[in-house]
Structures are given as C-alpha cells and as structure tokens.
C-alpha cells in the first residue's frame, strides 16, 4: 500500500511525507513488511517490542545528505505497520550510520501502549551529542528532543546502545571522545576511522571512554573505562538489578578485542573490564564492527562478535569470522566458538526468547553483495547453544540487521539498498517472547 500524509505539526512548516508499506507471503509462519519513506535513503534500522507492540526506527537521508529519524509502530506483532512519523523536530539534525543508528526502546505501562523512546546522534558546533525524544501516545507524535544527560561536552560521542530496566528506566551506554576534543587532528581521525595517533595509539585510546547514564538522569553519567575502540557499536542489557555492557577494547599493541563489564546494583558500581576472548586482532584503525549481547532466563551472558582469523589454508588471506562465547556469572567466558557463515560476516545482533531460543542476525558478503543471514539455536541445559545458519532468502541487498522478540516470534529488520531504491525490511520469525535483551 502507498500512503500520503501530513506529519504531526512541530510548530513549523513541514512538507508532505510520502511512504509505502508492502507485504508479501513467505514460507511457513513467517511474514514480511516493507517500510519506505519515498524520496529518502532508508537505512540504519533498530527495532523494539513489548508483547504485540513493535516499533521500528531508522534514518532517512535526502539526496543532499540531510537526515531525519522516522518511526513506525505495529500492534499486531509486526504483521502490519502504521504510517511512519518523523521523530526529530529540527529537520536534518541527525547524524547516523550503521554502527550508530537511531535506537528505539519501549517502556511498558499497564493497560496502555508502551512509551516509545528514540535516542540518536546529532551534529553540533563542538562535536556530536546524543538526543532523546519520547512518544506517550503510541508513536503517533513525539515530544521535542532533549539532550541525553552527560552528552553536551565538547568532542564527538555516539555508538550508543539502550536498554530498559525492570522499573522503566532507560539506560544508555556510549563512546565518548571529549578528552580528544582539544586535538583537532585526533578528532578528525575518529571521523576517518583511523588509528588514534602514533607512536602510541594505545595511550591515545585511553582518552576515549565508555560512558553510561540514564535518560532521566537518575543514573548519573560517568565514564566506566578508557581504551575503547573509537567507532564500534556498544551493547547493553538489563535484567533485574543487573546491567551488562560490552564493547571493543584497545589492548596493548593496538589489539582490538571484546571487553565486558557488569553491575549488580543498578549501575552504582561496575566490575573491572573483563576480556571476552584473546583474539589478538591487531589493527591500525577501527573495524566499525562491535558486539551483540543477550542474557537468558538463568542470567547467563551470551556474546557474539566479529574478528579477524587466519586463512583456511597456507598462503590464504586472513578473513573476518563470527564468534560466540558464554559466561555463567560474568567473571569469565567460555572459549570462543565459530558461527557458521557463508560469506564475510559483519554487524551481528542477538536476542533470546523466553524458551531460551537464541536468534543471531548478521549481514555477510558473498558473490559481490551483502545478504542478511540468521543463526538459530536452542540453548542446552549447560547454557551452550548449537547454532545453525539459516538464510532469510530475501531478494536484494541486506545490511545492518536488528532483532526483537515479540508476541511469540522474533522480528528481524534490516536495510535493503540498491542503486535506485531503499527500504526497511521487516520479517517475523517463529520463536518465543523476550527475556533479557538489549541493543
């Protein structure tokens, strides 16, 4: 179907918005929907769900590069969606990409639609900041944006992740480069994704921080550690009073491996950073490819990430592979296990259903194009999954997937982009509802 609508009034003139939504039959119980704001490059989606209420946010760029944030909601588990609404009141103020998309979260409320919260990166004269906006009418309108507490300092920040705790507090982790703001050459290197200066890139990386805070300010923003890899997405999960965070860390020798920390007291204190796996990926720059994480019903922590591995045979070039590890208590992780892929994998996401069914999504390069693929597994009694690869079978290119569990299924979203068209694809997959999940 194709829609023409006027966006909600923001106190200023706003042009007619055209969008389309199409649905097509799939095998089995799966169903798909396409979300498109016509005339925009639709990309960088995220998704959240609360029962049958599903919300998708994404960036829509004009030909000039000016980018806005859009959101659309479903009340039937992702089978159909209403017309998208522009989230940001200031036209073109978004600065988003695949590793720092607009993140959407839902805050449960009894006997009514959940509150819809969106967090995104915006441009500023002194660097980038994080903005937040909230809808209390089921995604029909959004309040004027406000700054995420702690993100108004000079310098660049972003690569954020969000999670909602059991009390409805929305927690955010992000990478923050305020300590590099005085060095314009270093600030430029972050935009170019280059190594953090020479001769001592590790020492410079210590000036880049992992921050945490809450949207309402009740969890005061603060740095948890330095030494973060500058342009890789982060991951955060909440479960009960616990907060779990994961990121790519810069270890001595410019080694860029996964790190993890947790709080068991609602964010008041955090454990020292823990290395997830000694992959020893040496890189003079940022791979733009961070971790995904979820927590199951037994509070076991599951992490998926990409890293560089040696070629399969003598003389073969190194290549990127996708790995999985699990921790029972957050003090150490199991040896990594390789996830089966059929191309070069990037940009993983992960959710776990109420029945401890795990779904992983990533995009992989094969035969000259990127396609979205899945890893599915039932978690054994010892906490270990047996992961099998499944192709989504989507036509066209697919990049930067995201996942949520909704009403007994998993909802997968991704961007489908070609030379003359772009859309956000939404597909329902047979599975169970959420436990502890994050983005």
Could you tell me what each predicted segment is?
Residues 1-9:
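Bacterial N-terminal signal peptides that target proteins for export
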Residues 8, 12-32:
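Bacterial Sec-dependent signal peptides at the C-terminal "C-region" and cleavage site
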Residues 24-439:
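Extracellular, repeat-based ectodomains that mediate carbohydrate processing or recognition
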């Amino acid at each position: 179907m194709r829609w023409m609508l006027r966006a909600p009034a923001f106190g200023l003139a706003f042009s007619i918005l055209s969008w389309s939504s199409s649905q097509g039959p799939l095998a089995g119980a799966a169903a798909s929907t396409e979300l498109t704001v016509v005339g925009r490059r639709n990309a960088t989606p995220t998704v959240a769900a609360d029962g049958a209420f599903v919300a998708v946010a994404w960036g829509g760029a004009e030909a000039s590069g000016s980018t806005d944030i859009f959101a659309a909601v479903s009340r039937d588990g992702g089978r159909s969606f209403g017309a998208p609404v522009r989230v940001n009141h200031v036209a073109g103020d978004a600065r988003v990409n695949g590793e720092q998309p607009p993140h959407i979260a839902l805050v449960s409320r009894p006997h009514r639609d959940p509150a819809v919260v969106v967090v995104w990166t915006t441009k500023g004269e002194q660097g980038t900041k994080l903005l937040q906006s909230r809808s209390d009418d089921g995604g029909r309108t959004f309040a004027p944006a406000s700054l995420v507490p702690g993100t108004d300092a000079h310098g660049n920040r972003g690569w954020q992740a969000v999670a909602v705790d059991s009390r409805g507090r929305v927690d955010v982790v992000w990478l923050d480069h305020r300590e590099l703001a005085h060095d314009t050459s270093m600030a430029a290197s972050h935009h170019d994704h280059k190594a953090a200066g020479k001769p001592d890139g590790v020492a410079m990386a210590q000036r880049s921080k992992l921050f945490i805070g809450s949207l309402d300010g009740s969890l005061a923003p603060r740095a948890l550690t330095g030494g973060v890899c500058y342009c890789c997405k982060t991951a955060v999960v909440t479960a009960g009073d616990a907060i779990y965070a994961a990121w790519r860390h810069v270890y001595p020798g410019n080694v860029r491996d996964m790190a993890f920390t947790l709080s068991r007291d609602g964010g008041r204190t955090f454990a020292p950073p823990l290395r997830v796996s000694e992959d020893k990926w040496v890189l003079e720059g940022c791979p733009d490819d961070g971790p995904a994480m979820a927590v199951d019903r037994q509070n076991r922590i599951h992490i998926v990430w990409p890293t560089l591995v040696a070629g399969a045979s003598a003389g073969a070039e190194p290549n990127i592979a996708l790995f999985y590890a699990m921790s029972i208590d957050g003090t150490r992780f199991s040896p990594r296990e390789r996830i089966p892929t059929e191309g070069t994998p990037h940009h993983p996401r992960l959710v776990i259903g109420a029945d401890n069914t795990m779904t992983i999504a990533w995009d992989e390069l094969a035969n000259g194009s990127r396609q979205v693929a899945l890893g599915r597994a039932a978690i054994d009694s010892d906490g270990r999954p047996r992961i099998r690869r499944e192709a989504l079978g989507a036509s066209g290119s697919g990049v930067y997937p995201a996942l949520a569990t909704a009403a007994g299924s998993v909802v997968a979203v991704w961007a489908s982009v070609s030379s003359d068209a772009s859309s956000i694809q939404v597909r329902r997959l047979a599975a169970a509802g959420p436990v502890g999940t994050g983005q």
